[in-house]
């Protein structure tokens, strides 16, 4: 391998190390994100499992409460304690009889006759088991069980029906007579009287009071629009508004037309080092270097294998040493060509909202509005002030008096109301009025709010001893628990003993036939069966 190739290998190694460093940073970031995702998933699974467990426990507790309510209802319907004892005695006798049936029967010993004085014979074989005996008499009734725990508080009862309407109460004593009220408003004018005889023409009476105001007239039509007024003075600049929220990014618009080439800009700052260019072509092979000084003799090597390798005359392969160290990196390659134009970047973020502009000119007046509806009739106005007294007229002639006597005199308008009169004396108390008729039944009111919970009920009776339940099914395996904390690092273990030497391996497969060796010396040494020169040949 030449120096150029070694240089190329060194460059690749340097790039590989740089890439490896970048890959290590990315792998660390990926591992951290995966750990956070796994932790979030574990927490969500744990919360779901906790909710499921709480739901199961709540359902079980509800079932137990329902069972206790049913037992309490049964005890309430059972009746007095005597009936409960009469019901429980036959059940207890039956249970005791079943227990006594299972007990083993003891056989009573029989007396041997006294006449036989023979020596006892050899022991006989064991007899067969006897038949099952009759059931024994029932045993005594057991003691009363321990009192059970207090029952849970009962649910509040349903609200009772609404009661009937109560009877009306007695009439109270008659109160004192009230004081006279204020004078009422003046009454309406009476009907006109009958036509009287024509009277003499009297003097002109005083001028009457002004009549009530007439009804409010309908609003007039809207006037025509006046001429446009002069523009008002310019307003003061307003306070700049607060910065608005960032708007939602809009979709990128269509690409605009290609602009004209711009002028050459100022020289930019030094750019950041670019990414490494593509791998250069391998350089030319350099000249062979000068031979270095001879190295120091190496340490004694380990004992070689005793396996005989047939080199078949390949002396160079037998004398070939280990591969040398890696050479220095080669010279840098030629810089690559300029790349193509990149893709357009993403649209920028919207800028901040600008300051508020100046106030604009006042707008033109709007068109006239529609005609409004007629308003309601207004209240009567206050009476007007009395007018001035008129001048006295001239005396009329006799003919004028006769003609005036024949005219119909119409009654004048009523005068103003007089002042209120003095308060009257207190009247005599009147007789007691009769009782009024009974009123109709009122409509039923709305349903009232729920009543307070009732007092705690008395403790329930002692429950009956329950029968032994069946063996429950094995529960389902529980969920996996949360992973425990990471344990501390253990102590360093002692160094193990040196292992025994392994068994020598099998003989390898015979290799391919080697290439022909170099030409021999003037006096070639004879070759042995292993392909090496005969010992002692090189010393001649």
Curated annotation (Swiss-Prot):
Residues spanning the membrane: 35-56
Post-translational modification: Undergoes proteolytic cleavage by furin protease to yield a 60 kDa soluble form that forms a homotrimer and exhibits a low affinity interaction with heparin.
Collagen-like domain segment(s): 124-243, 251-305, 321-380, 412-460, 463-522
Key words of the record: Cell membrane, Collagen, Membrane, Repeat, Signal-anchor, Transmembrane, Transmembrane helix
Gly residues composition-biased segments: 1-26
Cell location: Cell membrane
Biased composition (Basic and acidic residues): 350-362, 435-444, 486-503
Annotated region (Disordered), positions in chain: 1-28, 109-304, 316-540
GO molecular function: extracellular matrix structural constituent conferring tensile strength; heparin binding; identical protein binding
Keyword field contains Cell membrane: yes
PANTHER family noted in UniProt: COLLAGEN ALPHA-1(XXIII) CHAIN, SI:CH211-266K2.1
Name of protein: Collagen alpha-1(XXIII) chain
Organism: Homo sapiens
Gene encoding the protein: COL23A1
